[in-house]
A protein has these predicted regions:
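N-terminal subdomain of nucleotide-sugar transferases
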Residues: 2-65
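C-terminal amphipathic helix plus adjacent low-complexity
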Residues: 2-5, 116, 379, 383-442
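Donor-nucleotide binding loops and adjacent catalytic segments primarily
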Residues: 15, 218, 222-330, 436
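A donor-sugar binding/catalytic signature common to diverse glycosyltransferases
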Residues: 29, 37, 120-122, 316-364
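Conserved nucleotide-sugar phosphate-binding/catalytic loop shared by glycosyltransferases and other
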Residues: 48-94, 166-171
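Conserved nucleotide-sugar donor-interacting segment of glycosyltransferase catalytic cores
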Residues: 103-171, 221-222
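Long, low-complexity segments enriched in small/aliphatic residues
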Residues: 186-238
């Protein structure tokens, strides 16, 4: 079947056939994908991004073609804000409910974006759709992930980094958790995605992960590549997308100029079910330390109100991290991969208050590198505890460690390495397009 697709019909004008990158998520999930797409397009490869409608302006502003994929994570988090202490399985059930409603549209949307593609790249929760499209359309694929999902004896669990078991038990637990996650989505994926594409069900064991090539968009300086990963798994460095044409408001510039570099406090795309309580805790901690701070409300992690000392705090909705972080002394955030990357690249320490997902893992990695105190539990967080972490993060020792690590990260080019790896694998040469068996999500 593939041999027919690689005949003269495919080779004629196939250099113009697009690469399709599919992803769903928050800004922290989508911006790295756009950075990777820009890198590919700068090498002469037309790129389409298949993602949710709310990111269409960002995709188009960066010169990439946009195709819609049902799935609005901002709306999902607004409807179901993350409560402090909420269990991982409660989050998973909520996620399954939304996936079930979104996935009905995916086969037709995927065909529209990918039917004439020459390479598919799956990211995050869109990976399993891309695998099915690859099988149905006989198009090569690769996975590009933002957190380490490949099983290893040496990596802590992404969701529970503090839980470590002896080698074989640790690997077994990872497989068991993956199996549980698959069972949660099995009916939805087999029924809503694979059946409309004319594919058989994956089966009770779920997708096979043993042969897929995977690019990881984070730095080995933060999370070293495990020695038990095969060569088909490569860590490239962070994929960072600079903000285009952003002008800071005059009031922000005035605040920055009025005193020593402030702290940044913001939780990005996270929405707190009790944002007022968290905001009160943050302001009380700042009064204890006497430090100046920028309070970024984001999607709803903090609340902007008038009960703020204008000399000590400045409230803003958003500012690009690549512009703002070099101007602050440390960042208090949720621990998303993109925010961690921005803080590290700027050479500033972090204080991490995870909301869930992969955030405890990145908080663990930052603490292991000496550029953040141990993660703080959001549930019951007290001002005194946060104030102590702020003092730790702004200590000369931690600031020096962050500056040294930031220098190493600034010497990396994760996008260039990812593109070079795809070229080395032969996936960007028409002659090298040979579909590998892929029944998976990495």
């Amino acid at each position: 079947m593939l041999e027919h697709r690689l005949s003269g019909e495919q080779n004629a004008g196939s250099e113009d056939r697009p690469i399709v990158i599919a992803t769903l998520g928050t800004h922290g999930d989508v911006r790295p994908v756009i950075a990777l797409g820009r890198g590919l397009q700068q090498r002469g490869h037309p790129v389409r991004v298949l993602t949710s409608e709310n990111f269409a302006p960002l995709v188009k502003a960066n010169g990439l073609a946009f195709f819609p994929l049902t799935g609005d994570h901002q709306r999902m988090l607004q409807v179901n804000p993350i409560r402090a202490g909420q269990s991982m399985w409660a989050n998973c059930r909520m996620f399954r409910h939304h996936i079930a409603s979104w996935a009905r549209d995916w086969p037709s949307q995927g065909r529209a974006a990918c039917a004439d593609a020459r390479l598919l790249i799956g990211v995050g929760s869109a990976s399993i759709l891309v695998d099915s499209l690859s099988q149905a359309l006989q198009i090569p694929l690769v996975y590009a992930q933002l957190q380490p999902l490949t099983v290893s004896r040496h990596l802590p669990l992404v969701a529970r980094p503090q839980l470590r078991l002896p080698g074989p038990l640790h690997v077994g637990l990872q497989h068991a958790m993956r199996f549980g996650g698959w069972q949660l989505l099995r009916e939805v994926i087999d029924g809503s995605v694979r059946a409309p594409l004319g594919l058989p069900p994956y089966g009770w064991r779920g997708p096979d992960t043993s042969t897929i090539r995977v690019l990881y968009g984070y730095s080995e300086h933060l999370c070293p590549r495990p020695s038990d990963w095969p060569a088909r798994i490569q860590v490239c460095g962070f994929w960072s997308l600079p903000q285009l044409q952003w002008q800071p408001p005059a009031a922000l510039l005035d605040f920055l100029d009025a005193g020593p570099p402030p702290l940044y406090v913001g939780f990005g795309s996270m929405i707190d079910a009790d944002a007022a309580r968290l905001t009160t805790t943050v302001k009380a901690a700042l009064r204890l330390t006497g430090q100046r701070a920028l309070l970024a409300t984001g999607w709803g992690g903090l609340i902007a109100d008038q009960d703020v000392d204008s000399d000590q705090c400045f409230a803003l909705e958003h500012a690009p991290h690549d512009w703002l972080f070099p101007r602050v002394i440390a960042a208090v955030h949720h621990g998303g991969a993109g925010t961690c990357a921005a803080a590290l690249t700027a050479g500033i320490p972090s204080v991490v208050v995870p909301f869930g997902y992969d955030q405890p893992f990145w908080a663990h990695c930052l603490a292991q590198r000496g550029v953040a105190p141990p993660a703080l539990k959001r549930d019951g967080l007290q001002p005194e505890v946060l104030a102590h972490a702020l003092r730790q993060a702004t200590s000369p020792t931690m600031c020096a460690a962050a500056q040294a690590l930031g220098q190493r990260l600034r010497e990396e080019d994760g996008v260039a390495k990812a593109v070079a790896q795809l070229e080395q694998w032969g996936l960007l040469r028409d002659a090298g397009i040979v579909r590998q068996h892929a029944d998976v999500v990495c």
